[in-house]
A protein has these predicted regions:
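Membrane-integrated ABC transporters
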Residues: 1-40, 58-73, 91-95, 112, ...
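ABC-type nucleotide-binding domain
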Residues: 346-599
Length: 599
């Protein structure tokens, strides 16, 4: 009983999804199913009448009258066939429309769930396996369950009708046919479970094969692939994985096919026994020729409908197993969430931001990226974080914007732990340009507007943000200005240099007009002078706002009110530029080393 509950639960979920995607289409599908289920029985009955009428006409003297009746019955039979064909075409049209609607809705559900997931999930390969399986199954499994339910309903109605007819011949006939067909169902059940278990085991291999395919065909690795002649190596690895997957699947399918052939061979024996019994009764005058034809056709139809009925049950079982992959993904819960009663972030900040003895390590690792750091950022203050790669600078920004929560310690805004603040409100108050900023293959206008989608894309604000970031000159050179698609993925797109992409990302940050703005190595592709000019301009534009600057070039952070030097996840020095230089510590040594290259 407990095993059947997930099956019913999953089918119920898929049914609700299908209904929400189009109630009218669902009702129309059910009506068509009922109509198509009744027509075969009507066709059989008309066939019996035609045969009996022909038999009677052969013995009668009034051939014309008999032919007139036969013609009328043939006309009715033709109408039944025509209606069946029309209903079949209409059913196909409705099924296609509903399938498209369901697919769109499922993608919406997947996208919504993906947006909820924390960055922590992206540190775990199991998450990628779960996501991959959900993406594979989600577009069509609910629709297959719908089609399976409709097929089950249609075959059930047809079976009841044909079964009722066969009962008039002998009460044991329906059960006799069922016994012969059941072994096929058991084989389908068994191998559906085997296929499902295998498909879960193959996921890592399949993802790895897709990864090698993306390396070969995508633009990210294109230069190195050609420069180092790596194409054949990755293509061979792709082929090896694909061959393994194909051989494993073929082995499983071959075993299933062999088992089905054996069971199907046994399944046809009851039908031929019944054919012999029908012929025997007809020869002994216990049935008319019309009865023989009708019951002969009825046995054939019953076997066909029974196979369809049991096949629908097997398909529902298999699709239910694979639908569990989708529901497994949808069952994931974000860990960065609002409290029951989240608080609003103060506008504007009063006392500022305080970091209390914060430590953090990434999931699956015991190495602390941040180790007991404490600092205070006053409202409107401009600070800088400097240090070698891997010292924890970017991680600090992720904690500040609650992309992760600290392993220990707390971060407060005006004395309130940010975990108690509204997550949406907190992130609206912070604008970040990460070192690995996004490149959206959209228009230049959209690229900048995405920094503040709470408002319509006003031209004056977009242009102002572009000017502040220095992106306006690059955009002015484009074929269609702000309406030019950036990147080469789509038609008429134009590629930017790395430095120009960085300026567009900066414009996106300025567009947000947030009270707290963070620049995480946003100018790494600019030369030292361009970076200095940008930071100087930024320092002026950010007056009255809290700013956090992260840069590997110490000459560009000299204007910061306070500078914090991180090393191995700890703050080892802090102060103004002049104070740190005068102390002769790590900062002074690094500053002097860099200064030698610009003298």
């Amino acid at each position: 009983m407990t095993k059947s509950l997930p099956l019913l639960s999953n089918i119920a979920w898929a049914s609700r999804l299908v209904w929400r995607s189009g109630p009218c289409l669902t009702i129309l599908s059910l009506v068509l199913v009922v109509m198509q289920s009744v027509l075969p029985l009507l066709g059989l009955y008309l066939l019996k009448l035609i045969v009996d009428e022909v038999s009677t006409g052969l013995a009668a003297s009034a051939k014309t009258a008999s032919f007139s009746g036969i013609t009328y019955l043939i006309f009715l039979s033709g109408c039944v066939v025509l209606i069946d064909r029309v209903l079949g075409t209409l059913s196909s049209l409705v099924a296609t429309a509903q399938s498209l609607a369901v697919t769109d809705q499922v993608y919406g559900i997947l996208h919504s769930k993906s947006n909820e997931m924390d960055l922590e999930y992206y540190e775990n390969s199991d998450y990628y396996d779960t996501l991959h399986r959900a993406q594979q199954e989600a577009p069509y499994r609910p629709t297959r369950i719908l089609n399976g339910l409709l097929s089950l309903a249609q075959s059930s109605i047809s079976l009841l009708a044909i079964g009722g007819l066969l009962l008039t011949f002998h009460w044991s006939v329906p059960g006799f046919l069922l016994v012969g067909a059941l072994p096929v169902l058991l084989v389908r059940f068994r191998f559906a479970k085997k296929l499902y278990i295998w498909s879960r085991r193959r996921t890592p291999k399949e993802r790895q094969a897709l990864y090698f395919n993306s390396i070969i065909t995508g633009p990210v690795h294109a230069k190195e692939i050609r420069l180092f002649n790596l194409g054949d190596i990755f293509a061979e690895r792709f082929r090896t994985l694909q061959n393994q997957i194909r051989q494993e699947r073929l082995s499983l399918i071959t075993k299933r096919s062999a088992a089905e052939v054996i069971t199907q061979t046994g399944g046809i024996i009851p039908a031929f026994v019944l054919y012999g019994f029908l012929a025997y009764r007809t020869l002994h005058g216990q049935m008319t020729i019309g009865d023989l034809v009708m019951f002969y056709q009825a046995v054939q139809r019953a076997q066909s409908f029974l196979n369809q009925f049991l096949g629908s049950i097997a398909d529902l079982y298999e699709n239910n197993l694979f639908l569990a992959n989708v529901l497994e993904f949808l069952a994931l819960k974000p860990k960065i969430t609002d409290t029951a009663r989240p608080k609003a972030v103060a506008r504007p900040l009063q006392s500022g931001i305080v970091v209390h003895n914060v430590s953090f390590h990434y999931p699956g690792s015991d190495r602390p990226v941040l180790d007991g750091i404490s600092l205070r950022i006053r409202s409107g203050e401009h600070i800088a974080l400097v240090g070698e790669n891997g010292s924890g600078k970017t991680t600090f920004v992720k904690l500040l914007s609650r992309l992760y929560d600290p392993t220990a310690g707390a971060i407060t805004f005006d004395g309130t732990d940010i975990r108690e603040l509204s997550l949406r409100d907190l992130r609206q108050r912070i604008s970040v340009v990460f070192q690995d900023y996004a490149k959206y293959h959209l228009t230049a206008r959209e690229n900048i507007w995405l920094g503040n989608v709470e408002f319509p894309p006003r031209e004056d604000l977009i242009v102002a943000a572009a000017r502040q970031a220095g992106a306006d000159k690059a955009i002015a050179k484009l074929r269609a200005g702000y309406d030019t698609v950036l990147g080469k993925w789509f038609e008429n797109g134009e590629e930017l240099s790395i430095g120009e992409w960085q300026k567009v990302a900066l414009a996106r940050a300025f567009m947000r007009n947030a009270e707290i703005i963070v620049l995480d190595e946003p100018t790494s592709a600019m030369d030292a002078q361009a970076e200095y000019e940008l930071f100087k301009k930024f320092h002026k534009l950010a007056q009255g706002r809290t700013a956090i600057l992260i840069s590997h070039r110490l000459s560009t952070v000299r204007m910061a009110d306070s500078i914090y030097v991180l090393n191995n996840g700890k703050i080892v020095e802090s102060g103004t530029h002049d104070e740190l230089v005068s102390r002769g510590g790590n900062y002074a040594t690094l500053f002097e080393t860099q200064a030698q290259y610009y003298r």
